[in-house]
Amino acid sequence: MSVLKEYRTVSEVVGPLMIVDQVAGVHYNELVDITLHNGARRKGQVLEVQGDKAMVQLFEGSTGINLAKTKVRFTGHPLELAVSEDMVGRIFDGMGQPIDGGPELIPEKYLDIDGQAINPVARDYPDEFIQTGISAIDHLNTLVRGQKLPVFSGSGLPHNELAAQIARQATVLNSDDNFAVVFAAMGITFEEAEFFMNDLRETGAIDRSVLFINLANDPAIERIATPRIALTTAEYLAYEKGMHVLVIMTDMTNYCEALREVSAARREVPGRRGYPGYLYTNLSTLYERAGRLIGKKGSVTQIPILTMPEDDITHPIPDLTGYITEGQIILSQELYKNGFRPPINVLPSLSRLKDKGSGEGKTRQDHAATMNQLFAAYAQGKQAKELAVVLGESALSETDKLYVAFTNRFEEEYINQGFYTNRSIEESLDLGWELLSILPRTELKRIKDDMLDRYLPKADTTMTKVFVAND
């Protein structure tokens, strides 16, 4: 066994970064043990090596470091996470240390938090439905096992409540396989952390969940490690324990801000909006860890959540995320102001794999047809409401008024289900048919006659109310 060298050659500390001179045999991503002059211990990771100089990123900050008296020891291995099946039901900090007062874990193995690149040939195609209990997702933007489907939110929108709802309700139908949720919260406040912990505990969802919490006052470097630690846990549970794992990561905007902070400390040339030029590559190292592997029973599905700065979908974070992932769920300020929860704007939302996880044998044979018809009817109803605002209700035809009635009920009953209503896919489909019955059968052009005969209820014209927007 080789003896690890100890260095006392720290030459500079800038923000979360430390420069160590006269090093030898040091490698990128190597874990570093740091001992301060008062005996306190901290950890870091090698970020860059040039000649005999190593740049180390500090996980616990640089406060109190004395250049002359600080001891640095390079461990010879990357940052690793101690993993165990007993992690399910536990709460950890952003570096994977238990914070729930429970017993210390007995590690089954240690895994590199950066994971291993997945050979594309080894990937299995995502094609199994995951039920979230939310109609706007399950019916209209179906989530498939092994998919990565982000949520694009805005400032002040209830994405935390939506994340907690998905964590509580998500399940794989028609399967006896174990299902687990790995929840990574990055840069959140104490209040938000309390909300997530209490919600999962009170509803019993903590029993199948692993929760990692990085607070806003924790170091930026820890924020960069948190999603990797969460994904390493998910991969272990999926590929070695055969579990279907849903990874929820919020807020990816805080993660990207931490990347920008470290990049600025390294004096790198900034890219768009000051973010590092490698932001796309860095995000891909997280998102591409979702998927299924041929010959492996488990799977990793991702729902990354991000807040769009200034509600700008062209901002680098949502823009680059959209290039890597397979769709997006977009939350609406307008729906939120009107009291609809969750405020999912279904028209610009998209799941690129929704057709792979729907249909007979997965959900129901009428899934795709009703989805397309609901989209078309809602879009036409929105246009009719806008026309009524400009020209008045009298300018609408009788059919247009029915579309307005459909649109209002669609938002009030279908989208506005609340954060504690868990709808099965059958309930979502049946509700969709009930709303479509408002419209004349001749308008339902995207559904075949045999399905209309089987599923379409007879419209009760006395119950149909027409609402025209006045704003």
Swiss-Prot record:
* SUPFAM superfamilies reported for this sequence: C-terminal domain of alpha and beta subunits of F1 ATP synthase (SSF47917), P-loop containing nucleoside triphosphate hydrolases (SSF52540)
Report which superkingdom the organism of origin falls in.
Answer: Bacteria
InterPro entries the record matches:
ATP-synt_VA_C, ATPase_a/bsu_AS, ATPase_F1/V1/A1_a/bsu_N, ATPase_F1/V1/A1_a/bsu_nucl-bd, P-loop_NTPase, V-ATPase_su_B/beta
Q: Which GO terms describe its molecular function?
A: ATP binding; proton-transporting ATP synthase activity, rotational mechanism
Q: What keywords sit in the KW lines?
A: ATP synthesis, Hydrogen ion transport, Ion transport, Transport
Q: Name one GO biological process term.
A: proton motive force-driven plasma membrane ATP synthesis
Q: Which HAMAP family match?
A: ATP_synth_B_arch
Family to which this protein belongs? Belongs to the ATPase alpha/beta chains family.
Q: What does this protein do?
A: Produces ATP from ADP in the presence of a proton gradient across the membrane. The V-type beta chain is a regulatory subunit.
| Name this protein carries in UniProt | V-type ATP synthase beta chain
Which organism is this entry from?
A: Streptococcus pyogenes serotype M18 (strain MGAS8232)
